[in-house]
């Protein structure tokens, strides 16, 4: 009887870290989903902004580029209010004001989202192809359904007059 009790106790002690690990994984996954939800729901988050984040324990690091300084501070404030977040490291870059960059943004938006094959992405609430323009240099961020869409967006962006370079960071969903 004593041997059986010791064995049950030993099994319980061995199983406890696995239960705690699954609970912490569930908590981490909940935190990741909540951070994503709060960032996507920001009122002025649009196709010309790119927000990303990293969760390390209870610390959230915000990354990306935005066109408005208020969006940078709003992102930090909504993430700070999430239950379980202890600190926020805001590394979001505010893009410089430039009439030429604004003109390029509109021309790129029109070219990419009116292109047959890519026009279906324009119908989504938050279009998945984000167009980041900094001093004439373009970065395409986000997700597309196929490698062909990724290449088509790259060729289209390169064809817009006034673009100095295009960095294609689009990820193909699998």
Task: Explain the meaning of each model-derived region.
Residues 2-7, 19-174:
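N-terminal targeting leaders
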Residues 13-19:
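Hydrophobic core
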């Amino acid at each position: 009887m004593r041997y059986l009790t010791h064995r049950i106790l030993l099994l319980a002690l061995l199983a406890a870290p696995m239960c705690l690990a699954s609970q912490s994984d569930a908590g981490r996954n909940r935190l990741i989903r909540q951070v994503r939800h709060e960032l996507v729901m920001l009122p002025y988050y649009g196709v010309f902004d790119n927000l990303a984040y990293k969760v390390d324990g209870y610390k959230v690091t915000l990354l990306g580029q935005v066109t408005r300084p208020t969006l940078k501070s709003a992102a930090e404030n909504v993430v700070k209010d999430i239950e379980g977040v202890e600190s926020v490291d805001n590394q979001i870059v505010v893009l410089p004001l430039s009439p030429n960059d604004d003109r390029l943004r509109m021309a790129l938006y029109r070219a990419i989202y009116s292109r047959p094959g890519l026009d279906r992405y324009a119908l989504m609430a938050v279009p998945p192809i984000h167009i980041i323009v900094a001093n004439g240099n373009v970065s395409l961020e986000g997700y597309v359904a196929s490698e062909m869409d990724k290449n088509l967006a790259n060729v289209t962006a390169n064809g817009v007059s006034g673009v100095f370079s295009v960095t294609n960071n689009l990820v193909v969903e699998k």
